[in-house]
Amino acid sequence: MEIDFKSRINFLAGDNGLGKSFLLDAAWWALTRTWARGVLLPHLPPSKPEIEYAYTKRTAGQYAATSKFERESETWPNQRGRPPIPGLVVYAQVDGGFSVWDPARNYWKKDDRERPDAYHFRPDEVWGGLPKDKPEKLCEGLVTDWAYWQAEKGPAFAQLTRVLEALAPSPDEPLLPGSPRVISLDDNRRHPTLVMPYGQEVPLVHASAGIRRIVSLAYLLVWTWQAHLASAKLRGEPPARQIIFLIDEIEAHLHPQWQRRIVPAILDVMEALTGEHDIPVQLIAATHSPMVLASVETRFDTAHDGIWELDLQGGDVVLSEFPWSRRGDANAWLTSSVFDLAEPRSIEAEEALRDALELLRCQTPSKEAVERVGQKLRAALGDTDRFWMRWTQFVRDRGQEN
């Protein structure tokens, strides 16, 4: 399996279990030399698995390497020496966990391993701090940091507000911070709130799953950028000039209206965060959403963007680049090879239409067959379905009442 990611948008599509998350895990490892969700373990011998990877880096030139799996130690060895610097890397997992790699904080020389390889957050650690069960924190967590930033009224909260505005589901449903407040007798922390479109301030911990995921992404992006700037200043180095987002099921928990906006928002989020226009964003996202693909039609450029299909062919998983063309709407994407649906309808409606189309091709259909298929259509299609015009004309041409 070989994939040559494009420089901006990369969608991974395919049925469940064919390897989208596998590719995201492997991409994270190639960029950071760490595993976000545990080591990928290959098949049993006699196979001799290896991962070959290459990418451009901040300094001139391209980095390339090959790692061969060592079965005795169950590791994928890396080349010795300084690891390359791909830029900031953020990996959003579908269960609400996140991983962050920062070249200013996780970039080590020789065998100096006092610094963490990366920051791996379980879902509860995003909110409660990392590590959650120790008093000394690498990250205070969303609840504490948000309240502190808001009280401080400094650049971090200004950045958070801009990022939330950029990632909001629509102009009519902005993600506006409310007033932090205590929400439980057993927890004296002041919890962040959001002002809902209906005017009520709702604690973030009680918000919907979709809002919590996007707010978590916004928080970690600001936390990463703030800590990166401070660390880069201490090291006497310029800040990173690139960010890579790896996102598993980018549409998870999001209403279709939000699905339609999320990818353009992520591409523009660094401008909202930094106020600068020249920080490139690369997105590698797994998706099952035709709305997500339809949302980028006006931006898609085959020189910088790609859709990668994973298909099962003859018992093997095959990866290929989808030949890009505008489909026009989400239904057309559903019936493309990316999703492989014959019809964007219920199974019963699809079967009824299949039978009807077969009958339309028949030279001498029987009255009984026409009546039987007509009953199936009436049971499955809506009264205003566009297929009724064709079916009604077919029945009239044969002088049959149906």
Give a label for each model feature.
Residues 46-67, 190-198, 305-311, 355-358:
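Short polybasic amphipathic segments
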Residues 118-244:
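Extended helical coiled-coil dimerization/tether regions that scaffold
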Residues 1-36, 192-337:
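Switch/communication elements of ASCE P-loop NTPase nucleotide-binding domains
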Residues 42-47, 230-241, 348-355:
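Short alpha-helical "patches" and their helix-cap loops
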Residues 6, 13, 24-78, 83:
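Conserved P-loop NTP-binding catalytic core
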Residues 71-171, 331-338, 342-344, 348-357:
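Coupling/switch segment of ABC-type P-loop NTPase heads
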Residues 4-9, 298-302, 311-402:
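Acidic, Mg2+-coordinating catalytic modules of nucleic-acid enzymes
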Residues 43-45, 78-87, 207, 275-277, ...:
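A general structural signal for short secondary-structure junctions and capping/turn motifs
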